[in-house]
From Swiss-Prot:
UniProt organism field: Rhizobium johnstonii (strain DSM 114642 / LMG 32736 / 3841) (Rhizobium leguminosarum bv. viciae)
Gene expressing this chain: leuC
Function of the protein: Catalyzes the isomerization between 2-isopropylmalate and 3-isopropylmalate, via the formation of 2-isopropylmaleate.
Xref: CDD domains: IPMI (cd01583)
Protein name, per record: 3-isopropylmalate dehydratase large subunit
One of the Pfam families matching this protein, by short name: Aconitase
Organism classification: Bacteria, Pseudomonadati, Pseudomonadota, Alphaproteobacteria, Hyphomicrobiales
A biological process term (GO) from this entry: L-leucine biosynthetic process
NCBIfam families for this protein: leuC (TIGR00170), PRK05478.1 (NF004016), PRK12466.1 (NF009116)
Keyword Kinase attributed: no
An MF annotation (GO) of this entry: 4 iron, 4 sulfur cluster binding
Ligand binding ([4Fe-4S] cluster): C350, C410, C413
Pathway terms, separated by semicolons: Amino-acid biosynthesis; L-leucine biosynthesis; L-leucine from 3-methyl-2-oxobutanoate: step 2/4
Length: 469
């Protein structure tokens, strides 16, 4: 009888082509997502060596990082470097026979929102993209992670990837979440617990009652930020919620093929007694709404907390780092999080730019008005999310409250397009990274859930969403 295996073990074994004595493996790749930033050199490498894309039907190209989200984006991209990258992707996709969603295609959006929407992402698959937040697709029980540009070229040419197997890590979130505490709070709490290096060298499987209770979109939020916890990939075993989400998606299996697929997907569960190299357990009932205070995703605290004092940290290197973070963020130890005022609010990104996120925001802001001191924007994660939100009338609620309702794209998650912070501006953001300069030169980013961001936009400062009227 074979040894019990984890979900990661099973997907790995199903895709292992070859293994060398030193542990170097060749892994088959089922799906390859491509965007404009990390692919130009990869396609050029194919061109220079006379190679083709081995499996264009398993490759999907989407523009997201550089595209403007302003209503006039049909007039073109002003920044020359951004325009060149977008044009290169269109040219490369056409030349190499890869399906491509341009900025004028309603299926366009952030690549990690588009993949699941289209049924391109399926359980048990290996999925890669030249983007660190590829871990998002792990919500479907797929082994998904980011790769570098040279690896993008390798996958395009061979549909395989060379790598060594990671260790297994389990993060279990037991119990039920309190009202108004979300998937975003779960993953921020996990990163706060394990640190940004806590998952290094591991693939994390998320499990427990609180994880199972999440919708597919909530699970995508959790898996999206696995990389911020240091792990290469995050996984959640598929279940009936997964199967229901997939049914009817454009690229998903249909009819008998779907039934056969579901029969296989049901085997994608960790066996009883399987070994994890590390186990972390959190109590869902104890989790509050969370806000980041520093310049790392591990710098998190309850919205009811105060900015911590780095002098309380024994390790000198870490202590120095946290003082630097406070200096950058313009904060002093002991400041109440609810006393921190804001200049900007950004709701969107591959972490929280889906329809359920926007519905939560609408509940918070309906009938209210954005604070006069705040500039707030909502960026749907894809053209289909935008279409759905407008069909439900959410855009009218947002506009009436004073939010800027934008076109789909990565937007202010990162300073690679026109949406960015000015030096010194403080932003409540539903994105995934609060590094120095991430949203703009000397911009100050606080990571929060969509509902928390929405409430902060109305109040002009952080508020506890549990006390929101």
């Amino acid at each position: 009888m074979s040894a019990p295996r984890t979900l990661y073990d099973k997907i790995w074994d199903d895709h292992l082509v070859d293994e060398q004595a030193d542990g170097t493996c060749l892994l088959y790749i089922d799906r390859h997502l491509v965007h404009e930033v990390t692919s130009p050199q990869a396609f050029e490498g194919l061109r220079m060596t006379g190679r083709k894309v081995r499996a264009p039907e398993k490759t999907l190209a989407v523009v997201d990082h550089n595209v403007p989200t302003s209503p006039d984006r049909h007039l073109g991209i002003k920044n020359e470097e951004s325009r060149i990258q977008v044009e290169a992707l269109a040219t490369n996709a056409a030349e190499f026979g890869v399906e491509y969603y341009s900025a004028s295609d309603k299926r366009q959006g952030i690549v990690h929102i588009v993949g699941p929407e289209q049924g391109f992402t399926l359980p048990g698959m290996t999925i890669v993209c030249g983007d660190s937040h590829t871990s998002t697709h792990g919500a479907f029980g797929a082994l998904a992670h980011g790769i570098g540009t040279s690896e993008v070229e390798h996958v395009l040419a061979t549909q395989t990837l060379i790598q060594k197997k990671a260790k297994n890590m389990l993060v279990r979130v037991d119990g039920q979440l309190p009202p108004h505490v979300t998937a975003k709070d779960i993953i921020l709490a996990i990163i706060g617990e394990i640190g940004t290096a806590g998952g290094t060298g591991h693939v994390i499987e998320f499990a427990g009652e609180a994880i199972r209770a999440l919708s597919m979109e909530g699970r995508m939020t959790v898996c999206n930020m696995t990389i911020e916890g240091g792990a290469r990939a995050g996984l959640i075993a598929p279940d009936e919620k997964t199967f229901e989400y997939i049914k009817g998606k454009p690229r998903a299996p249909k009819g008998e093929a779907l039934e056969q697929a579901i029969a296989y997907w049901k085997t994608l569960q960790t066996d009883e007694g399987a070994h994890y190299d590390r186990v972390v357990v959190l109590d869902a009932a104890s989790l509050p709404p969370i806000v980041s205070w520093g310049s790392s995703p591990e710098d998190v605290i309850s919205v009811q907390g105060i900015v911590p004092n780095p002098d309380d940290i024994p390790d000198e290197t870490k202590r120095t780092s946290k003082w630097r973070a406070l200096d950058y963020m313009g904060l002093k130890p002991g400041t109440k999080m609810t006393d921190i005022t804001l200049d900007r609010v950004f709701i969107g990104s591959c972490t929280n730019g889906r329809i359920e996120d926007l519905r939560e925001v609408a509940k918070v802001v309906e009938g209210k008005t954005v604070a006069p001191t705040v500039d707030a924007m909502i960026v749907p994660g894809s053209g289909l999310v935008k279409e759905q939100a407008e069909a439900e009338g959410l855009d009218k609620i947002f506009k009436a409250a004073g939010f800027d309702w934008r076109e789909p794209g990565c937007s202010m998650c990162l300073a690679m397009n026109d949406d960015r912070l000015k030096p010194g501006e403080r932003c409540a953001s539903t994105s995934n990274r609060n590094f120095e300069g991430r949203q703009g030169f000397k911009g100050r980013t606080h990571l929060v859930s969509p509902a928390m961001a929405a409430a902060a936009a109305i109040a002009g400062h952080f508020v506890d969403i549990r006390e929101w009227n």
